[in-house]
Every structure is written in C-alpha cells, then in structure tokens.
Amino acid sequence: MPRKIEEIKDFLLTARRKDAKSVKIKKNKDNVKFKVRCSRYLYTLVITDKEKAEKLKQSLPPGLAVKEPK
C-alpha cells in the first residue's frame, strides 16, 4: 500500500528504519520520486528541486539497496 511523505526529514527517518528494504529513484523532467519499500507500506517522497534530490541521494543510508531504473 502506498503512503506519501511530505518532508525530507521524515523520509530519511523512514529510510533508516529496520524494516526498510530498498529505495527506488524515479526521475522525470519535472520531479524526482524517492520510493522506500518497508514491510507494510511503500513510502513516496516527491522533490521538484534537482539539487535537493542529489543531496538526498547522497544522504541515504549506506546499507540500503538503491535502484535507479533507466
């Protein structure tokens, strides 16, 4: 089931959770979507600023599998 996250801080807390499995990064021309898969929900954060998206990509936890479909 999907859930939307509005704040970057909340997304990072969710990504650091023990049940977080992977992160998918989907890029469009307008925005970047970060989707983190946890045991119950798929949490989505939408960012329209490309620079913020790059910073967030670098601040993801190192143990998490990051998938970037082309």
From Swiss-Prot:
GO terms for biological process: protein-RNA complex assembly; translation. The modification N6-acetyllysine is found at K9, K67. One of its GO terms (cellular component) is cytosolic large ribosomal subunit. The keyword Ribosomal protein applies. It comes from the Eukaryota. Pfam families: Ribosomal_L38e (PF01781). There is a cross-link at K4, K9 (Glycyl lysine isopeptide (Lys-Gly) (interchain with G-Cter in SUMO2)). GO terms for molecular function: structural constituent of ribosome. Keywords: Acetylation, Cytoplasm, Isopeptide bond, Ribonucleoprotein, Ribosomal protein, Ubl conjugation. Coiled coil: none annotated. Belongs to the eukaryotic ribosomal protein eL38 family. Component of the large ribosomal subunit. The ribosome is a large ribonucleoprotein complex responsible for the synthesis of proteins in the cell. Component of the large ribosomal subunit. This is Large ribosomal subunit protein eL38. It comes from Macaca fascicularis (Crab-eating macaque). The gene is RPL38.
